[in-house]
Structure formats: structure tokens, C-alpha cells
Amino acid sequence: MPSDQFIDYLKYVENGSKIGWDEDQQLWFPHASPEGGNDTIAYGHKLRDAEVEQANKGLTDDEVEELLIEDLEYATDGAKAILSTHFNEDFNSLSENSQEMLIDFAYNLGSYGLKSFPKFVGAVCNNDIDTMCAEYKRYYTDGFGAKKELKQRNEEFYRLFLA
């Protein structure tokens, strides 16, 4: 299970401004996903078709915590699989810090997203801090096709894992 510090980090970088939180009702409501498709709720949970109706009624903090834990387990399993099949590395042999770095990438990008960062993944597996620092930054393409840095997430990632 990831550390509390990592879970707090993930909550902050996924939705630190608490988009979709209704203070009066003490419920979370869906909001549009930047990548399109089904809406997202709380901490980056992409709603499945079967979840939409219930989510539109609002979810409690406990319910979104459960979704976060499920999504973290899914990201962890995905990171383990990609590390084994594409990098010939054993996830369980890595330090907790290294595991959490890879889980963060899998949570944010999907487990296959790790394949897009082979130098970073290799550096994590070899505890090569210099290469990690050179390769950790993530970007997105805006609606006009321009590549933009995920600045806040990158800064928080550096602060937690690499500083």
C-alpha cells in the first residue's frame, strides 16, 4: 500500500483545487475530463459507464477514497506488469520511493504510459538520480497542438521524490 504522503501528493496533483466538491452538500460531483469521454470525479477517477448515474447524484468523501484506492491498486498492478514485460525488472525489488514514482506515472498516464519513458524507468530501476532528474517531466498537447509542461505536477513530483 502506498504511503500516506504519496496519497496526499496524488490528491493534490490530481485535484488540489477540489473541482467538483460541493461544500454545502459535502459531496463530490463529476467534472469534464480534459481528454474527453466520460467525466472525471474527485482525484482523477475516470467514470465508467456503470458509475455515471450514481456519481451524478454525488459521492461522499469515503466513496471517492475507495475509488482512489482501487485506482491506485490498478496503477500498481499495471506498473508491475509493464516493468516485468517491457523492462525485465521486478517491481517488488524496488524501494518504496521508486515504486511510488512508477505508480504515479501509471496513475497519471495509464500503465502503458510508462513505456513512453524508458530512460526514466531505467533510471528508477538503477537508482540513477541524475537521469531521473533529466527525464521525469511530463507534458500534454493542448487543443491547438502545442506541447505544454505539466508544470505543477512536475514541480510537486520533484519535491517529493527527487529533491
Could you tell me what each predicted segment is?
Residues I19-Q25, A81-S95, K119, E135:
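Surface-exposed patches in mature extracellular/periplasmic domains of secreted proteins
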Residues M1, Q5-D8, G16, H45, ...:
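Long, amphipathic alpha-helical surface segments
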Residues E35, I41, Q99-A106, G122-C125:
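Amphipathic alpha-helical segments that form the core helices of the histone-fold
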Residues Q5-K18, M101-F105:
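Short, functionally critical alpha-helical segments immediately adjacent to catalytic or ligand/cofactor-binding
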Residues W28-N56, L68, L72, T76:
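Substrate-binding/active-site groove segments that recognize
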Residues M1-P2, A32-E35, L94-N97:
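Extracellular/periplasmic catalytic domains that process cell-envelope and extracellular macromolecules
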